[in-house]
Amino acid sequence: GYIDFGEDKENEFEIEWVNTFNYFFKVALMYAKIGEADTAYHALIRLIKCLYSGTQDSKMFDIEDPFQMLNPNWDQVYDTLFSTMKQVIKDSNQLSLQAIDMWIMTNFKSTEQVLMCFNDLPSIESAILLNIEEHEYHWSTQHKLYQLLKDVYKIAAPSFDEVALIKKLVRFNSNFYVDLATCYMSRYQWKEALNTLLSVVSHLTHPSLNEEAELKLIQCYQKLGMYKDAFDISKAIFLQDQTYSLYLKTRILAAKADVLQEFLADIQPLLTFSNDRNRNMNILRICSYEGYCDRLYYFASNSKGAYGNEYRNYALKSLIYRVLFPKSLQQMNLLLFIHFIKEDASLGIIDMRKYVLTQDIQDKLLLDAIELLKQMIQYQIDGHKRHTYEQAAYECLLMKEIYEYLGMSDQFDTYYSQLFKVNSRRPLLKEALRKHVGYPG
């Protein structure tokens, strides 16, 4: 028969190059220990350049990050690399350029060591600015270089003017205006920050910066008392990414801008379910927070698929918490259930807006909770496992205590007797029910 040795050969190659590199790193460190700085430095340079090439071409080592495969003491390697570099390269300009190159090639993991290597501020700044210019199409690298330059200044000139520093960088990339605005904000110069952001928000080249700039704009508008402008941006962000946290922020701004009712009316068409679990959970949280209990119940009770029981569980907690917290109850399991809801700190529930409810509405919401429990119990029974039967029994106990609180224990007795009858051939289920709830009748 045909035997494929290809995978074994690949594994042998992987083990061989890893062992070889680990050995060469040990040898380079040994040379440094015996005072052969020049030999150690050039060996480490070649090893790191080779590994860096592998990060740029994954076919070279058949792995995206070959550094992760090796196990030398990287702190010791970087300490030795930059200390020997400082001994070998005497010209401060050349030293700064080489140090920056190596810092980039180590995937920015040698910041502590590269900072110890620098000794001349003008040459360091010149080298970093040159690299920022050369990496014009790599914003992430440019920004890390800026952060390194800032760290250098914190050590060499702690009282430096960060605004002046950032203004040197905006000519290389307009994205740096966001950092400039951030700096103004840290100085409580809200007007300057606002004008800076407005001048650049439509010219940003990195996707993550757009949202960052918009959030900073909202903050600036708020600080300047321009709530309608802050609300307009926040609403636009919320419409794109309908998270619960964004909803709350936008709602607060709507109230401050005196457009809350218009906002609540505008979002009603958005409160619909889809196939997106995260979006659906956010819809449930909003409905729970606002007290849209009928809609909450409708969504949960009509949900199918893998997440249906999760939605029902959330809606159940919301309905019970709205009606019964913080009432004193004689039903101990129900009381514990409410305690666990509070401990769990479910968003949209523990922070919900509370309203005065008539007794009829309270009773209706608890009856809706019972209907959800019936669905949840059947879901657990259909799981056909001992642990799902145990969960079904616990949910049955909660239902019993809700009926008891409502003064409708006879309705639970009817349901419970029928449950036993329908599931007469499920001894494990009946055992769990008897243990938690008791015998029917």
Over which residues does each language-model region extend?
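Eukaryote-biased, non-catalytic alpha-solenoid scaffold regions
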Residues: 1-441
